[in-house]
Amino acid sequence: MKFLLINGPNLNLLGQREPLIYGSETLEKIELNLKKKAKLLGVELECFQSNSEGTLVDCIQQALGKVDAILINAGAYTHTSVALRDALLSTGIPYVELHLSNTHSRESFRQKSLLADRAIGIVSGFGAMSYSLALDGALDFLKSQKSGV
């Protein structure tokens, strides 16, 4: 089984960017820990980050037929990008939306997601652990789909 982790704008600055909101772990460390966990679960994990909307769309489209699920922290694009939504829906790849912070306890503009209604699940507010929970959720979803439960 293969998953793709996509991180959007400004997530490359984790560890320095507003640590009271996003925590002190770097994206590199989060990805390393998630890859270790994925390997233990028998999942190959590819990681990708970009600050560019078009590059993220290209990445999603290129995943078609290559991955079983997408874990996506679209950052601010969560609230604004019809292009990311359309790319995710056009591939038909199941995806989990995830966020480090609890977006529902923040500014009103962060409380609306253009991705959430079609995601297989949403994980928000658990800091770096949100990534691990998203991995677990996607894996459980795919296993239940295969077993028909």
UniProtKB/Swiss-Prot annotation:
Q: Does the keyword Lyase apply?
A: yes
List the residue(s) that the UniProt entry marks as the site Transition state stabilizer: 17
What function does this protein fulfil?
Answer: Catalyzes a trans-dehydration via an enolate intermediate.
* InterPro entries attached to this UniProt entry: DHquinase_II, DHquinase_II_CS, DHquinase_II_sf
Question: Keywords, A to Z?
Answer: Amino-acid biosynthesis, Aromatic amino acid biosynthesis, Lyase
Q: What class of enzyme is it?
A: lyase
Name one molecular function that GO assigns to this entry: 3-dehydroquinate dehydratase activity
A GO BP term here is:
aromatic amino acid family biosynthetic process
Read off the Gene3D superfamilies from this record: Dehydroquinase, class II (3.40.50.9100)
Which family would the database say this protein is a member of? Answer: Belongs to the type-II 3-dehydroquinase family.
Span-the-membrane segments of this chain are none
Catalyzed reactions per annotation:
3-dehydroquinate = 3-dehydroshikimate + H2O
Q: Active site annotated at which positions?
A: 22 (proton acceptor), 99 (proton donor)
According to UniProt, the name of this protein is 3-dehydroquinate dehydratase
- Which amino acids does the record list as binding substrate? 73, 79, 86, 100-101, 110
Q: Name one Pfam family in it.
A: DHquinase_II
Give the pathway listed in the UniProt entry for this protein: Metabolic intermediate biosynthesis; chorismate biosynthesis; chorismate from D-erythrose 4-phosphate and phosphoenolpyruvate: step 3/7
- What assembly does the database describe for this protein? Homododecamer.
Q: Which SUPFAM superfamilies match?
A: Type II 3-dehydroquinate dehydratase
Enzyme Commission identifier(s): 4.2.1.10
